């Protein structure tokens, strides 16, 4: 679990997301409150429930990007889902309970990786011994049983030294490794994913733990043996329990496109993929117990962050019970020309840096001038205003169009430097930006 302070979290998000300070602060406080809650005594800790967040803002301003970056910072079970993928219980489609099942699966993977990393040193020792057993088989007595030697032989010690120094890396050995589990692909209708995974695990267990002799270079065998030995040192039951605890205490669910499940106007008949989904989300957000293949999971202390553009619907179109369970509202602002300029230059791996690196692989040096950056930002903003406003995503479209000619001829331009200034941008984009019909279809 992350122990970063809110200021540190915001600072980390600033490296990738421009503006939207209110949203960053709310998310940072929510994440820090998870840590604060764990410092309380058990009785009070049980009473403190997370304050769920609803992020409202037009498309392309950073809602989903905040979720992506938060997943890396949280160091806790995290899952991002699209609200539009779910239907009401009893109809064809995914049930909302599958969110918690997927979150638990993610937690099991995360906890397994942590447990393997914790046992890595011991696993390396065991893997080393197995390789030495192949290189210098231990002495056997008259009954064919391996004798336990008090002291390793001089030859074994010499080989151990060579192995650690990497002198034997390219030597081939034949070694017994655990055979890969039997792979069974099962096609199931939507909504039956849980049954499919249970059947697959059942078929895999039928195969048992078979050993298979393989001929490998020592450096490759070492990697596989370390994984195998580390997996043996992990207790599966303990791992499942740790994963369930991690989900219940630190789990975070990000629900995107929640505005798409708002009811629009009066309609007769069941609304299975809109209001029905909202009703099914209520118990999850409020707190209930969900059955997963790893055990029962309580959702009382899972943090839910929902986001939506709300261009057609309004937050008040959500059913009142769900509105009440998303108490913190954060509005994200539409992006301006100056925001676009910052997006093109400030993030760690901004789009311009990516294009420079891509063209450098062909030996072409690309230079973006300040005037060029400003003109690209103005063109993107202008197209957003005259057609549909898709936020920062418009920059990808504009830049791809601008770089199309260079990308096509890159192999012939090796060794050259191309300067992209305001004149270059105007020459390639002005006609498209000015013609609304063209920009509607091309940009």
Swiss-Prot record:
Keywords associated with the record: ATP-binding, Chaperone, Cytoplasm, Nucleotide-binding, Stress response
Binding site for ATP: 18, 60-65, 256, 321, 393
Record keyword Cell wall biogenesis/degradation present: no
GO cellular component terms, semicolon-separated: HslUV protease complex
Molecular function per GO: ATP binding; ATP hydrolysis activity; peptidase activity; proteasome-activating activity
This protein's record includes keyword Cytoplasm: yes
Known role: ATPase subunit of a proteasome-like degradation complex; this subunit has chaperone activity. The binding of ATP and its subsequent hydrolysis by HslU are essential for unfolding of protein substrates subsequently hydrolyzed by HslV. HslU recognizes the N-terminal part of its protein substrates and unfolds these before they are guided to HslV for hydrolysis.
Subunit structure: A double ring-shaped homohexamer of HslV is capped on each side by a ring-shaped HslU homohexamer. The assembly of the HslU/HslV complex is dependent on binding of ATP.
Name of the molecule in the record: ATP-dependent protease ATPase subunit HslU
